[in-house]
């Protein structure tokens, strides 16, 4: 179901980490070059209304969040459980279209964090699949070659290493 013409979008930031929600609100304000008109920050709430009328709200991934409705979901893959994503987000993001209105972020992925291990990667991919279904285009962006599609997987059991290859 799409938003009615003229209705401003409402973004829900699904994360257990309020500081990360605050960071995401500030990042979206900067990236969209839209100043914040009203801001509420407290222990249990983080909310912003931009000058253009767009709203951003921190939504804790708990059963009590199910009454909130939004048009776009920003989902923290590190703190939202697979069950919450599968059972509640499609009903909370009532006006969202899976191909356009979901943003996946990972609050555990910082410059100081360790690289993903296999269990973490599987966890993140299962959560994405719960919303998008099967994603057929898997790859990465390379500064030299641009978009590179993953085409082959090799496993070195002795070194406990998995390698993804491309056509290049």
Regions found by a protein language model. Name each.
Residues 1-135, 149:
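Phosphate/NTP-binding elements of NTP-utilizing enzymes
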Residues 125-168:
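Detector for the mature cores of small, proteolytically processed
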